[in-house]
């Protein structure tokens, strides 16, 4: 938490020094607002990981329709993707695929994958979400990542070098933990025809 809090302090100082410069003040306040959003997201993710780590098994499980889950997540992410001119394309190659679990946690798993794909995709590209009988995949059209970085994807706080988009390096760790609690496995790879792909299977 030190880094985002230190950045907030710097941004506050800049805003105070820009009291006589309306444009500079507005820019500093906008950066401060973004910094608060990043810090809030980091705290939320840390709390989520802490709660997940304390779970040995899931309570209140129920049958979850994976196709419905993916459709709901795509609709929730639609506006965010549109802001970056990114098209979300859902391919349902199977239907009535049911997995026992906690709907809220499985929804969080899918949202984290979609958020990651949208965040690191170039403007005007596509994100493909594909459901098959025993798996679903989320693939972006970004540049992919190096083999060295790929080996560490999913580690807590790890972010590949050269990432411009803001992030904490916790989203894919949360995905791995939720998947594990549901008897699922997750693979991360560079897609054969370009982009980065997450595969969740059971």
Say what each PLM segment does.
Residues 11, 34-42:
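Short alpha-helical segment of the dimerization/phosphotransfer core of two-component systems
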Residues 16-23:
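Short acidic helix/loop segment immediately C-terminal to the autophosphorylated histidine
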Residues 62-63, 82, 87-97:
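Conserved catalytic submotifs in the C-terminal HATPase_c
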Residues 117-118:
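Short helix-loop "hinge" at the ATP-lid/N-box region of the Bergerat-fold HATPase_c
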Residues 145-157:
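Short conserved segment of the HATPase_c
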Residues 60-75:
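A conserved beta-strand-to-alpha-helix junction within the catalytic ATP-binding
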């Amino acid at each position: 938490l030190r880094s985002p809090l230190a950045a907030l302090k710097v941004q506050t100082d800049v805003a105070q020094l820009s009291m006589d410069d309306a444009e500079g003040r507005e820019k500093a306040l906008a950066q401060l607002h973004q910094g608060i959003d990043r810090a809030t997201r980091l705290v939320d993710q840390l709390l989520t990981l802490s709660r997940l780590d304390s779970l040995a098994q899931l309570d209140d499980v129920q049958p979850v329709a994976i196709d419905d889950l993916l459709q709901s997540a795509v609709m929730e992410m639609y506006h965010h993707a549109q802001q970056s001119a990114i098209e979300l394309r859902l391919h349902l190659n199977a239907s009535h695929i049911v997995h026992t679990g906690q709907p809220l946690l499985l929804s969080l798993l899918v949202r984290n994958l979609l958020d990651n794909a949208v965040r690191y995709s170039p403007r005007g590209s596509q994100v493909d979400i594909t459901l098959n009988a025993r798996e679903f995949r989320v693939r972006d059209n970004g540049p992919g990542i190096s083999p060295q970085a790929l080996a560490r994807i999913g580690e807590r706080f790890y972010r590949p070098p050269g990432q411009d988009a803001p992030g904490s390096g916790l989203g894919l760790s949360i995905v791995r933990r939720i998947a594990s609690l549901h008897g699922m496995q997750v693979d991360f790879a560079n897609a054969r025809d370009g982009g980065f792909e997450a595969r969740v299977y059971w």
